[in-house]
């Protein structure tokens, strides 16, 4: 797997990770839909300590609206508003990079869909993809 690189819409915030992705996950929960401004959120999970901000300083929003009620930190560009990545204690030392910020998303092959109980009825999940009604155990 090559280095994962990406950044925000305006280019002020750039990141990279040299780690192999832990998973590629599509989240259908209401919180992620609102955060992404879309019908779901496509994320690439990497070890948190592998994610390096190369330029810029992302702003942080502390979100407590998830099912656990624990803090979930959402990082975004303060200039253009692009959501870059997120992490929280409930998920251990994992950072979830927003796939839309990748320089090259063509290698993505998401096969895990979570919070399918909150999936919008007009969103189709590919046949054979693993589905979980909430967070997998």
Give residue ranges: language-model regions.
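A short Gly-Trp-Pro
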Residues: 1-137
């Amino acid at each position: 797997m090559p280095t994962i690189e990406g950044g925000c819409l305006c280019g002020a915030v750039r990141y990279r990770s040299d780690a192999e992705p832990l998973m590629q996950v599509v989240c259908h929960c209401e919180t992620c839909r609102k955060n992404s401004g879309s019908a779901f959120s496509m994320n690439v999970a990497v070890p948190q300590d592998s994610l390096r901000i190369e330029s810029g300083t992302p702003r942080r929003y502390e979100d407590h609206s998830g099912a656990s009620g624990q803090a979930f930190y959402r990082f975004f560009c303060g200039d253009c508003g692009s959501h870059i990545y997120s992490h929280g204690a409930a998920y251990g030392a994992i950072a979830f990079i927003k796939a839309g910020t990748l320089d090259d998303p063509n290698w993505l092959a998401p096969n895990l869909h979570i919070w399918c109980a909150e999936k919008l009825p007009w969103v189709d999940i590919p046949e054979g993809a693993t589905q979980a009604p909430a967070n997998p155990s």
